[in-house]
């Protein structure tokens, strides 16, 4: 689902619709006022797009240069961006980076270091949420800090894995395990990389070090041929930005809280939530596509070659746009949206809970971690609780259709496929919007008001299916199919 700084990015793009008129005064404050945006929003937008000239500078002047120069460049530019956006509050990130380095050096590759890192970094982030919380989305230092928190926790776990015997690690853990001892400059460069400091994406220390060593290129010994792929992602991001800018005055979060919405027919309330639920995610899509382009341009997006020898630039992709736009399933949206954050949680939380012996419990705890990572508001918990419920029910429905001969035959009728797709998409985006209502409104008085207006439809629908589906499965799946499945 949506990523950390999601709300803050949303607030930024919400205010982008006024960015087109020209102004004469170049003062940021006056410029922002003229555009109908906040100064913080303007600073954030400028900082995200600043990644492109910085990536060009790196390509032409620092590629294959001494590693310490590259680390210094990333550290200086990242700290400058932090100061430009948050002033003296940039010290929060710097403090956590330095303390994390000390934890690695003083505690070494131990479980104690991992537990200390997890507790300290999450506690610092949650304390930041608590002391800066308001009833609305604000662009403040906690926005990039939640991205940094995952980076530093992942860094410590990979460092811990680097001290283990290779045979005791999975192939994935071997890929990310850090065998050497990172210096303070390396940790700082990794943390402050300009293309991902503010809004992500997540990437590992090993991948970052490949960038520094000049290994992330499709032409060994030369700069990566990544300008066109980067411009394609930038262009796609701008398409989403223009669409969002034009439509945002007409499809707003605030309308869900109005009396006019309450007084509309039930079908209208549901249809508005469906359309809004799809549209509200475009602000996140925009930011991630733009920052992905920065990562590709620098080379960080290089992901080797496919089986046909075609170069892949999706190492930092946070979106699978085609899948996101066409999938009729909730799992499809999860697989296509905020990819690197979801992969991080799967790698460092979900799979590490394997010892519990219960996949659903591990998944539930992973989603609880994600909810807390997003913030302390109740809406985040409700949103991820709905995701957990929906995914479980969707798996049960898929299993029922697959195992039932009657339903399987009905589902395979070609002439009915367009109808099935339309029904699936309607259910999919209606209840995606239902879940996003709590996420975007986030305080209990707001999301509760909207849920009451549609009679808690999402909870009633999926909780009913959760209890009814086992009986339907028992009635419609022949005994021999059940025995075959067990075998």
Swiss-Prot record:
GO terms for biological process: chylomicron assembly; endoplasmic reticulum membrane organization; intestinal stem cell homeostasis; negative regulation of inflammatory response; negative regulation of response to endoplasmic reticulum stress; phosphatidylcholine acyl-chain remodeling; phosphatidylethanolamine acyl-chain remodeling; phosphatidylserine acyl-chain remodeling. It comes from the Eukaryota. It catalyses: a 1-acyl-sn-glycero-3-phosphocholine + an acyl-CoA = a 1,2-diacyl-sn-glycero-3-phosphocholine + CoA; a 1-acyl-sn-glycero-3-phosphoethanolamine + an acyl-CoA = a 1,2-diacyl-sn-glycero-3-phosphoethanolamine + CoA; a 1-acyl-sn-glycero-3-phospho-L-serine + an acyl-CoA = a 1,2-diacyl-sn-glycero-3-phospho-L-serine + CoA; (9Z,12Z)-octadecadienoyl-CoA + a 1-acyl-sn-glycero-3-phosphocholine = 1-acyl-2-(9Z,12Z)-octadecadienoyl-sn-glycero-3-phosphocholine + CoA. The chain crosses the membrane at residues 44-64, 84-104, 111-131, 180-200, 236-256, 285-305, 364-384, 422-442, 453-473. Lysophospholipid O-acyltransferase (LPLAT) that catalyzes the reacylation step of the phospholipid remodeling process also known as the Lands cycle. Catalyzes transfer of the fatty acyl chain from fatty acyl-CoA to 1-acyl lysophospholipid to form various classes of phospholipids. Converts 1-acyl lysophosphatidylcholine (LPC) into phosphatidylcholine (PC) (LPCAT activity), 1-acyl lysophosphatidylserine (LPS) into phosphatidylserine (PS) (LPSAT activity) and 1-acyl lysophosphatidylethanolamine (LPE) into phosphatidylethanolamine (PE) (LPEAT activity). Pathway: Lipid metabolism; phospholipid metabolism. Its EC number is 2.3.1.-, 2.3.1.23, 2.3.1.n7, 2.3.1.n6. Disruption phenotype: Mutant mice are born at the expected Mendelian frequency, but none survives beyond day 2 due to an extensive triacylglycerol accumulation in enterocytes associated with very low blood glucose levels at birth (P1.5). Conditional knockdown in intestine results in hyperproliferation of the intestinal crypt and increased susceptibility to intestinal tumorigenesis. The active site is at 338, 374. This is Lysophospholipid acyltransferase 5. The di-lysine motif confers endoplasmic reticulum localization. Glycans are attached at residues 225, 308, 331. Pfam families: MBOAT. It comes from Mus musculus (Mouse). It is found in: Endoplasmic reticulum membrane. The modification N-acetylalanine is found at residue 2. A motif (Di-lysine motif) lies at residues 484-487. It is a multi-pass membrane protein. The keyword DNA repair does not apply. Belongs to the membrane-bound acyltransferase family. Keywords: Acetylation, Acyltransferase, Endoplasmic reticulum, Glycoprotein, Lipid biosynthesis, Lipid metabolism, Membrane, Phospholipid biosynthesis, Phospholipid metabolism, Transferase, Transmembrane, Transmembrane helix. Induction: Up-regulated in response to liver X receptor/NR1H3 or NR1H2 agonist GW3965. Up-regulated in peritoneal macrophages upon exposure to 22(R)-hydroxycholesterol. Its main location: endoplasmic reticulum. One of its GO terms (molecular function) is 1-acylglycerophosphocholine O-acyltransferase activity. GO terms for cellular component: endoplasmic reticulum membrane.
């Amino acid at each position: 689902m949506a990523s950390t700084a999601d709300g803050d990015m949303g607030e930024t793009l919400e205010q982008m619709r006024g960015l087109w008129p020209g102004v004469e005064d170049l003062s940021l404050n006056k410029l922002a006022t003229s555009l109908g945006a906040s100064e913080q929003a303007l600073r954030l937008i400028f900082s995200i797009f600043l990644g492109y000239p910085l990536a060009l500078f790196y390509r032409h002047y620092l590629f294959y240069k001494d590693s310490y120069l590259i680390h210094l460049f990333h550290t200086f530019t990242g700290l400058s961006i932090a100061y430009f956006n948050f002033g003296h509050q940039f010290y929060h990130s710097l403090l956590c980076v330095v303390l994390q380095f000390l934890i690695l050096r003083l505690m070494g590759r131990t479980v104690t270091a991992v537990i200390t890192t997890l507790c300290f970094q999450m506690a610092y982030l949650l304390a930041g949420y608590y002391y800066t919380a308001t009833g609305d989305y604000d662009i403040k230092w906690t926005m990039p800090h939640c991205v940094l928190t995952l980076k530093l926790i992942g860094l410590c776990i990979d460092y811990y894995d680097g001290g283990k015997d290779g045979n005791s690690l999975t192939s994935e853990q071997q890929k990310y395990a850090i065998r050497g001892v990172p210096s303070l400059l390396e940790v700082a460069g990794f943390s402050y990389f300009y293309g991902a400091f503010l809004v992500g994406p997540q990437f590992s220390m090993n991948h970052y070090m490949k960038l520094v060593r000049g290994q992330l290129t499709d032409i060994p010994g030369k700069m990566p041929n990544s300008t066109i792929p980067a411009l394609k992602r930038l262009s796609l991001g701008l398409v989403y930005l223009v669409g969002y800018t034009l439509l945002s005055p007409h499809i707003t979060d605030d309308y869900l809280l109005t009396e006019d919405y309450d007084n509309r027919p039930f079908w209208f309330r549901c249809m508005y939530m469906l359309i809004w639920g799809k549209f509200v995610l475009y602000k996140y899509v925009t930011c991630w596509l733009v920052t992905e382009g920065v990562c590709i341009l620098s080379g960080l997006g290089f992901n080797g070659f496919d089986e046909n020898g075609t170069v892949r630039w999706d190492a930092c992709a946070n979106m699978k746009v085609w899948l996101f736009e066409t999938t009729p399933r909730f799992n499809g949206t999860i697989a296509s949206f905020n990819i690197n954050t979801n992969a991080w949680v799967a790698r460092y939380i979900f799979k590490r809970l394997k010892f519990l012996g219960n996949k659903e419990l591990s998944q539930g705890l992973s989603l609880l971690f994600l909810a807390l990572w997003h913030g302390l508001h109740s809406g985040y918990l409700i949103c991820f609780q709905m995701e957990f419920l929906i995914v479980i029910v969707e798996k049960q429905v898929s299993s029922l259709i697959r195992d039932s001969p009657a339903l399987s035959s009905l589902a395979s009728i070609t002439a009915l496929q367009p109808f099935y797709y339309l029904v699936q998409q309607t259910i999919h985006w209606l209840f995606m919007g239902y879940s996003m209502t709590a996420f975007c409104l986030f305080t209990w008085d707001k999301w509760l008001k909207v849920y009451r207006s549609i009679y808690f439809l999402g909870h009633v629908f999926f909780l009913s299916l959760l209890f009814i589906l086992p009986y339907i499965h028992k009635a419609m799946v022949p005994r021999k199919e059940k025995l075959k499945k067990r075998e």
